[in-house]
Amino acid sequence: PDAKRFGRGTKFISVMDILNNQFICYDNIRASVEVMDGDIDTYGVNYGDILFQRSSETLEDVGQANVYLDSKPAIFGGFVIRGKSKGNYNPLFFRYLLASPTARKRIIVKGAGAQHFNIGQDGLSKVSLDIPCMQEQKKIGELLQCIDARIATQNKIIEDLKKLKCAIIE
């Protein structure tokens, strides 16, 4: 999109949104863009869509993935690949699955490049992963989300204790 269209309008999912969020929700998408006719049809994302980082300066980061967990309209940019559901899956579980060491290894080998590494839809479509039944996906996703929430709480407590310690020392 033209640079003048940025800063207002429809939320625009960039690579930074994929990398810097546990999950992508409408309210944590940083950028906005004025959309043209047909942009929503072509680049729109729906709840549960998987978004991949198309290119990276390091092979280890190519194909990093996240999921959109909102129903509000948003679009994705050119350095992002959108994956649509071919079947039934739990988006929460899938986010964790795609970040697992096994999935990362299988995605990384599909990347190509010398100084800048890329992966395309064709490469991603050839990645094979073992996926449990929907009931198990739901349980695993919820458990991992609970663990992440607990880790975040503990990290906040640690930060607060560090601040308290500094205040006492000063």
Report the location of each language-model feature:
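Sequence-specific dsDNA recognition surfaces
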Residues: 1-2, 16-50
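A short glycine-rich beta-alpha junction/loop motif
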Residues: 7, 73-79, 89, 101, ...
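Cleft-lining beta-strand/loop regions that shape enzyme active-site pockets
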Residues: 13
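Short, ligand-facing micro-motifs at secondary-structure edges
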Residues: 19-31, 50-76, 92-96, 105-109
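Amphipathic alpha-helical segments
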Residues: 94, 128-167
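A cross-family detector of function-defining hotspots
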Residues: 170
